[in-house]
Amino acid sequence: MDIHQFFLGNAFDAHTYFGAHVTEQGVVFRTLAPNAAAVDLIWEGGDWEPIPMQRIHDGGVYELTVPEAVAGQMYKYRITPQNPDGDIIDHCDPYGFGMELRPNNASIIRDLSSYTFHDKKWLAQRGNHRKKPVNIYEVHLGSWRTNPNDPNGWYTYEEIAPKLVDYVKKAGYNYIEFMPLSEHPADCSWGYQNTGFFSPTSRYGTAHQLMQLVDTCHQAGIGVILDFVPVHFAVDGYALNHYDGT
């Protein structure tokens, strides 16, 4: 990512830079907190003891590489505001790729590179789909079907994939639009109050399972539209609200 273009508002790949990324050197954590006095990483592998992050850019970018961190571990950012009377708050990662199931709210390190898609045929034909009629089936994943074997009634992304694809194909649809799947605090909502913008809600599984759902749709000739609402964010204190103390 070009950091200069990011601050100009022109970087569309910020998720590849910010967040927690698994590398050969360990996990690299980066977050943006321009008005913070200090940012610490706290994570389960370090017994949740604060580790200072380094401010690497005048715009407020903080970074830390943890060699022993691995995918699947939980973490948060502990942000100290400049105001001495302000509260020191532990926040989830706005760019994280995974979060705990509510009411817990730690971010989870995910390695998205380990999934291999099998949708080359769909991708090769995708450009031609704009010339064809579009019939979109909008669905709220959590209420579309009830799983009698789950205490919350939810199917995982992986479990619901064949059921949903079969229904959509029989009904004559060629696209599925998923109502927001980003992490959100309330079960009763449609998902429009985000806490983890790049974290698929853990109600239905992991990012890899969501990737498998999309892959299954594509292999069946079904396009996927994700309802992504970055302008709606929850006011919960652990999320983006007052993230750097302002």
Regions found by a protein language model. Give the residues of each.
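Short proline/glycine-enriched turn/loop motifs at strand-loop junctions of beta-rich domains
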Residues: 32-38, 46
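Structural beta-strand segments of beta-rich domains
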Residues: 25-29
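Short beta-strand/loop motifs in extracellular/secreted proteins, especially
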Residues: 37-40, 73
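The feature marks proteins involved in alpha-glucan
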Residues: 1-24, 47-48, 56-138, 143-152, ...
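N-terminal cofactor/phosphate-binding cores enriched in small/glycine residues
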Residues: 52
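Aromatic-acidic/polar surface patches that form glycan- and anion
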Residues: 30-32, 55, 153
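Substrate-binding/active-site clefts of carbohydrate-active enzymes
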Residues: 122-131, 140-246
